Amino acid sequence: MSDRKRKGNDAPNSLSNRDTVELPDDLSLSDSDSDEPLESFGRKIEDLSSSSEEEGETRQQVQSVLQENPSFRLTGGSSSFCDRSRDIFAQLDSAAKLTSKDLGEDNILDGTLARPAPPSPPHAVQNKCGVGQELTKKQPPGKKLPDYLAHPERWTHYSLEDIDETSDKKNSQVAHEYIRELQDSKRSQKAALETFTPAFNQDHGSSNENKIVFAKPKSKDQSGSRADHAKKEEVGLQHLDDRVEADEGEALQQSSSWPNKEKKRKWGVTKEEDDTVAPSAVFTSSKRVNRKNFRKTPDDNDGDKE
């Protein structure tokens, strides 16, 4: 029941009856506004003024933290060496942090190394290239005169004004006549090839020099006459053999006259044996003997003196 009474009392202030809401006379704009927005604006101003100071403090804090806990450490060695290495690597890490803030909004580090800066936009280069391309564009070529009008001296003009026009029938007749002439010339060439019989046995005085010439073999009579002629030539050389034999006989006679008695006895014995023994065949050489090669005996010298 209490809920219904509250609803009944709030009925005049509902959305449907908001135009009929009665406002008190003492109400003003200053009373309706609250002090909360003024406090929020003051806080924002204080934050902006203190942001620059906080940046410097954060940098100092980062450096101190990095110096205390560097990402890279060297263990071992003397204390002075450890202090130097710690200072060096702490400065490197702080420099990487400071440069990473200038890269952009996405301040992301891949380990201890910073991401490289993005490349500069190539808008300026594209604009320059675009201007050059527009200038280098070829203009559409205009209509040019044909060459036979621009340079008539290079061309020859043919006209058929003096020739009478002929009908189709006459043109066909001329074409048929030309075809017949070609056929007749081909037939005549074929007939000439068929009637040609190559003759191989021709005289040397023939006009066709490139043709093959065959000669008949000679008869047996001619071959016999050649043999007789060869025999005659052999007979004509017999006088040379006679001379050679005469020279050999003289040489034998000279060698038979020896002054020693023992040689004579031997010759006497040999003569008797020759008489008893039948004469044997004597072979003589056909070489010509030079008499100057034989030594002269004292009998020959006496004979020459006499």
Curated annotation (Swiss-Prot):
Protein associated with the U5 snRNP, during its maturation and its post-splicing recycling and which is required for spliceosomal tri-snRNP complex assembly in the nucleus. Has a molecular sequestering activity and transiently hinders SNRNP200 binding sites for constitutive splicing factors that intervene later during the assembly of the spliceosome and splicing. Together with its molecular sequestering activity, may also function as a molecular adapter and placeholder, coordinating the assembly of the U5 snRNP and its association with the U4/U6 di-snRNP. This is U5 small nuclear ribonucleoprotein TSSC4. It is found in: Nucleus; Cytoplasm. It holds the Pfam family TSSC4. Interacts in a RNA-independent manner with distinct U5 snRNP-containing complexes, the mono-U5 snRNP and the post-splicing U5 snRNP-PRPF19 complex. The lineage of its organism: Eukaryota, Metazoa, Chordata, Craniata, Vertebrata. Residues 1-81, 109-128, 182-306 are annotated as: Disordered. One of its GO terms (molecular function) is molecular sequestering activity.
